[in-house]
Amino acid sequence: MSRSEELYTKAQISIPGGVNSPVRAFNGVGGSPIFFESAEGAYMIDADGKRYIDYVGSWGPMILGHNHPAVLEATLQAAKRGLSFGTPTEVEITMAETIRKIVPSIEKVRMVNSGTEATMTAIRLARGYTGRDKILKFEGNYHGHADSLLVKAGSGALTLGVPNSPGIPEDFAKHTLTATYNDIESVKQIFAEMGDEIACIIVEPVAGNMNCIPPVDGFLEGLRSICDDHGSVLIFDEVMTGFRVAPGGAQDRYKIKPDLTTLGKVIGGGMPVGAFGGKKEVMDYIAPVGPVYQAGTLSGNPVAMAAGLAALQQLSTPGLYDQLYQRVDTLLDGLQERADRAGVPMTTNRAGSMFGFFFTEEPEVTTYAQATQCNMEHFKTFYHAMLEQGVYLAPSAFEGGFMSAAHSEEDIQNTLNAAEKAFAKLV
């Protein structure tokens, strides 16, 4: 028995399912989860001392790679000054100013502790601002585990086959309307029936929780137009895409300006952080200046702010994003070439430094339905073949991959060599 297997057995005694987030349990691929002990750059080391090229990046935050020296130093120096004060700090102001500079649609921003907190509060704020109860989300989009947002969700909920979680009262769920991602007509139909009751549309501008599915042409533009016509708030959930698919997130990449934006992952540099921000007129509805309440003991934590600020400063390095995009292109073009050569039906998607691949006969995957109809057995076999060769991918066919600035051309080539052997097991 490996050390990871021993730890998993032990963990299940004290922790539900042996994990603190469901997708980590390997239910989507079978077998026991790998326990990790350290990480550096593009690599992680497991409890048995095996090294892996990592394309999960802590589910998105590690865009610079693990243990980046500048982020680590900023974190250590901040920790020496105090782990938490529960008071305003100057670093909060600097973080807010930095976010506003990079994401122009954000005129004011509130820091919280997680992406779930950010989306939960953005929904509450939109309801308070509009005086309406209903919200519209998209099938397969995941916005954290708040009650009103777990209806037909993606990510771990989709991996486990339970997109509607028990424990959510019908009175909550009835206010959550769902449309089809990348199908603007489905949105128009809902708004034609009850547009004056809908407080907001919340969307992953690049769907990253049913693998990686970018928006089709006109989809985000259509959402902006519908919200303008009906007085609804447009919320971009950029917890995953923020600072990753482009310096200013998906709204920068696709040139669409939302009313509110939620952030997380990258802005913490690896520490637990979330944020929501947007138009001044909307943000001024949040307490203490407005009637919509939100609070948090550790919101704006000085150590997390220091880590995130250091990460954002590093992202301004000239050429960094171009390198990320080039690495993704090299990886995905290489994967497609090897899959085609092996006779394995597969297609790939990409958006900035996010990527995904689907085992399917379809020439492209643009919808939730297509993602769920892909060959899951092929994915499981491929996943374990890559794992054996020291390549760590997300243990679910419904999670995308993430490139970091620490990945080298050699890492990409080693990944492609491993993939060639893995594809051979599928024919």
Curated annotation (Swiss-Prot):
Homodimer. The keyword Cytoplasm applies. PROSITE patterns: AA_TRANSFER_CLASS_3. It catalyses: (S)-4-amino-5-oxopentanoate = 5-aminolevulinate. One of its GO terms (molecular function) is pyridoxal phosphate binding. It is an enzyme of class 5 (isomerase). Its cofactor is pyridoxal 5'-phosphate. Pathway: Porphyrin-containing compound metabolism; protoporphyrin-IX biosynthesis; 5-aminolevulinate from L-glutamyl-tRNA(Glu): step 2/2. It is found in: Cytoplasm. This is Glutamate-1-semialdehyde 2,1-aminomutase. Keywords: Cytoplasm, Isomerase, Porphyrin biosynthesis, Pyridoxal phosphate. The keyword Transmembrane does not apply. Its main location: cytoplasm. InterPro entries: 4pyrrol_synth_GluAld_NH2Trfase, Aminotrans_3, Aminotrans_3_PPA_site, PyrdxlP-dep_Trfase, PyrdxlP-dep_Trfase_major, PyrdxlP-dep_Trfase_small. Belongs to the class-III pyridoxal-phosphate-dependent aminotransferase family. HemL subfamily. Gene3D superfamilies: Aspartate Aminotransferase, domain 1, Type I PLP-dependent aspartate aminotransferase-like (Major domain). The lineage of its organism: Bacteria, Pseudomonadati, Pseudomonadota, Gammaproteobacteria, Alteromonadales. GO terms for cellular component: cytoplasm. GO terms for biological process: protoporphyrinogen IX biosynthetic process. Its EC number is 5.4.3.8. The modification N6-(pyridoxal phosphate)lysine is found at residue 265.
